[in-house]
C-alpha cells in the first residue's frame, strides 16, 4: 500500500494540497465581506429603503440567477483555455471593486445594481474555482477537498455577521459604516488568490476542447451528471434564499441589532458540519447523505412554522445549517466525479445555471407566498419541494452511488 493511500485511509483530515487550503481562505475572506453586507441587506432594503418582502425575494433570486448564468460561460472558457486561476481572480476582483457601491448607494436602484454586479463576479469565479479544487484534489479525496473549502467559505459567512453585529453596535445602527468596513476583507481575498494560489500543470493526455458548449461536448457529460443536476434542481426549489430566515426572525421579534445572529447561527453549524460531511461522503453512500440532508431541510421548515418563539427559531436555523453542511460539498463532489476532467468547468457552469434558475423560481415563490398568504406558507412550500426531491432521489440512488 502506498504512503498516499495509507494517509487517505487513516488520516482523512490531512494530506490535502496547500492550494485547496489557499482557495478556502480566499473564499473565507470574500464571504466575511459579502456576509457583513448580506446579513443586513434584507432589513436595510425593507426598513431603510422601503422595499417589500416580494421585492427582496425578486432581488435575491435575480442576483443569484445572474451569477449562475455567468458561471456557464466562465466555466466553459476555463475548459477552452485550460486555465482556471485567471478567471477566478477576475471574478474575485470584480466582487471586490463593487463592494464600495453599497455604502455609497443613494437609492434602491443603486443597491440592486451593486448586488447584481457583485453576483456577476461570483458567477465568473464560481465554476473555474470549483474545477480548480477538483483538479487539485487527490483521487478519492474530493469529498474532503470540497468539504474543506466549503467549511472555510462558511466560516467566513459565520464571521461576517458577527462583525456586522459588533459594528452595528459600535456605529449606532449605521448601515453604511458597516458596509464600508466590509470593503477591506474583499481586497484581502483578491490579493491572496493573486499571490498564494498556484494552478497545477495540465495533466498529460487530457484533450483540448475547442467548443465546450457544443452539443457533442455536452453529450459527453453523461447520464450520471444529468441525474445529479436533476436531483439538485428539485432540491434547490426547496432551498430558497436565506434572506427569508432573516425576515422570519424579524417577524418573530428579534431586535435589529441581533438580526445578523440568524446567519451567524446557520453558518456556524454549516461550517462545523461541511468538512466532516465531505470526509464521510468519501467513505459511504452519497445518496444516503443526500436523503438525510433533505430530511433535515424538511424538519427545519416545519420547526420554523410550528415551534414557537426564539427557541423554535434557533432550532430551525441550526437544522437549516446542518442540511447545508451535509449537501453542498457533496453535490460538488458528485459533479467532479461524473464528468471528464477537461469538461469540469463546463459541468459546474451548467450545474449552476440550472440550479440558479431554480433558485430564482424558489425565491420568487417564497416571496409571493410570504406577501399574499403569510410566512408559514413559504416554509411549508419549501418542505413540500424537499419531499418531492426525496421521492425523485429514490429511483436515482443506484446511478448516483
Describe each PLM feature range.
Residues 2-17, 199-231:
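Juxtamembrane intracellular "pre-TM" segments in multi-pass secondary transporters
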Residues 10-64, 225-262:
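Helix-loop boundary and gating motifs at the non-cytosolic
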Residues 43-48, 159-177, 361-375:
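Transmembrane alpha-helix termini and helix-breaking/packing motifs in multi-pass membrane transporters
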Residues 70-82, 168, 273-285, 370-371:
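Helix-to-loop junctions at the C-terminal end of transmembrane segments
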Residues 80-92, 283-294:
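Cytoplasmic membrane-interface "Motif A"-like loop-to-helix N-cap segments
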Residues 93-106, 295-308:
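C-terminal ends and interior cores of transmembrane alpha-helices
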Residues 114-155, 334:
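Cytoplasmic helix-loop-helix junction between adjacent transmembrane helices
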Residues 183-205, 389-397:
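C-terminal membrane-cytosol helix-exit motif in multi-pass small-molecule transporters
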